[in-house]
Curated annotation (Swiss-Prot):
Lineage: Eukaryota, Fungi, Dikarya, Basidiomycota, Agaricomycotina
The species this protein was found in: Cryptococcus neoformans var. grubii serotype A (strain H99 / ATCC 208821 / CBS 10515 / FGSC 9487)
GO process annotations (BP): fungal-type cell wall organization; glycogen biosynthetic process
UniProt note: phenotype after gene disruption: Leads to an absence of beta-1,3-glucan and a strong decrease in alpha-1,4-glucan from the cell wall, a decrease in intracellular glycogen at 37 degrees Celsius, cell wall organization defects, and scattering of glycogen rosettes throughout the cytosol. Decreases survival in macrophage-like cells and leads to a decreased fungal burden in the mouse lung following intranasal inoculation. Simultaneous knockout of GLG1 exacerbates the glycogen synthesis and virulence defect.
PANTHER family to which the protein is assigned, alphabetical: ALPHA-1,4-N-ACETYLGLUCOSAMINYLTRANSFERASE, TRANSFERASE, PUTATIVE-RELATED
Membrane side Extracellular: residue ranges: 1-24
Keywords, in A-Z order: Cell membrane, Cell wall biogenesis/degradation, Glycogen biosynthesis, Membrane, Transmembrane, Transmembrane helix
Topology of the protein relative to the lipid bilayer: Single-pass membrane protein
Tree of life domain: Eukaryota
One Pfam family per UniProt: Gly_transf_sug
Cellular component annotations (GO), alphabetically ordered: plasma membrane
Keyword Calcium: no
Gene: GOE1
Name under which the protein is recorded: Glucan organizing enzyme 1
Localization: Cell membrane
Cytoplasmic side: 46-366
Length: 366
């Protein structure tokens, strides 16, 4: 039982010189002393480290977990390159860019499709703004044409093995095969994966210190908030090798259904990010995928100056090639210089020194 003064009885009286004294309330003083004692005890006698569930044997044959060798790295497929070192100390992401291209079936006896000028400019943007140690070009059928001849010396070509299935589920469409192949490249090699219609507008350096980074793709439904996107778009993937998030993403293909478009390439990674938020760094739709593809956004990007890519601070622009082909297929060095619009202003720095001469020769052949 507490003494009377601690139970709200007499207050504490502290005598002072010259017959003065201070009267203090008893209970607060007691609580203060107890709190101080608890704090000092915690500082000088920290709690022991947590023990694993159960109790280790006292047997002399016990091998402590601290003595275990590091686990071996996963078996890397021969068609995926070894991870490169990151660009700077502290970065986690290897200094490499990956493209996956040419998986679309080609009739026997035919060559690959001609690389379009807009794709050449996109790869030039990565070369100029990312300055990677290597640009890996994973392919089944190599492209052809003058723009390919210009960009090819800057690429490391990798003849790939196209996955036909995953976890026993068939991959019938070449786009789904490309989805899986890019994840395999990120798992075993790491770096920055880019779709062929991604224009890099500034360096990614500040994004390379986190194991995995993805960007939101906004929903075309205006009733949904910015934090309720369509998903996380796989047109840009930034990752270290063997990241937990990429492993989860690949494992999710156990439920793959080729009849549901974009389910595992956009919707599923957002679901995984919400379930495991510390495993992936998520950027808003304004980082990579803005302006969007719906409504008049593509038209505004190619016909007006409404959007300023430099002032926006965004890292890249996804050109939505399948929907913007009417604009992209007509690009030329001259049209980019002469026509004032948001897209042309953004891509002008990527025009190469031989583009005008090459375009004239190409045009004569068409």
């Amino acid at each position: 039982m507490l003494p009377l003064w601690a139970r709200g009885g007499k207050p504490i009286v502290i005598p002072l010189p010259q017959k003065r004294h201070i009267t203090l309330p008893a209970l607060p003083i007691l609580l203060l002393l107890l709190g101080t004692g608890f704090l000092l005890h915690s500082l000088f006698f920290p709690p022991p480290p947590p023990h694993p569930p159960g109790k280790y044997t006292s047997s002399p044959f016990l091998v402590k977990p601290s003595d275990f060798l590091a686990p071996p790295p996963p078996d890397r497929p021969s068609y995926i390159p070894e991870p490169l070192q990151p660009k700077k100390k502290g970065m986690l992401v290897p200094d490499a860019v990956h493209y996956v291209y040419g998986l679309k079936p080609v009739p026997e006896g035919k060559t690959g499709e001609e690389l379009p000028y807009y794709a050449y400019l996109a790869m030039r943007s990565a070369l100029i703004n990312l300055k990677p140690k290597a640009i890996y070009f994973h392919y089944e059928h190599l492209p052809t044409g003058p723009w390919w001849d210009l960009i090819r010396p800057h690429l490391t070509l990798i003849k790939t093995q196209v996955p036909e299935s995953i976890y026993g589920r068939p991959l019938k469409h070449f786009a789904h095969k490309a989805d899986v192949l890019r994840l395999l490249a990120m798992k075993y090699s790491g770096g920055i994966y880019l779709d062929i219609d991604i224009y890099v507008t500034k360096p990614f350096d500040d994004l390379l210190y986190y194991p995995t980074t993805l960007g939101m793709e906004a929903s075309p439904d205006s009733r949904r908030s910015a934090l309720d996107p369509e998903g996380l778009c796989n047109a840009i993937i930034i990752s270290q090798p063997n990241s937990l998030f990429i492993d989860r993403w690949l494992a999710s293909y156990e439920t793959f259904d080729g009849g549901i478009w974009a389910q595992h390439s956009v919707v599923k990674p957002w679901q995984l990010a919400r379930e495991h938020p510390t495993e992936v760094q998520v950027l808003s739709e304004r980082a990579f995928f803005w302006p969007m593809w719906h409504g008049d956004e593509i038209k505004k990007t190619h016909e007006t100056n409404h959007h300023d890519f430099k002032a926006s601070g965004q890292y890249a622009y996804h050109a939505w090639e399948s929907l913007a082909m009417g604009y992209l297929s007509k690009l030329s060095p001259q049209s980019i210089r002469e026509n004032e619009n948001s897209f042309n202003k953004m891509v002008r720095p990527f025009i190469g020194p031989k583009d005008d001469e090459t375009y004239k020769k190409w045009k004569r052949g068409h």
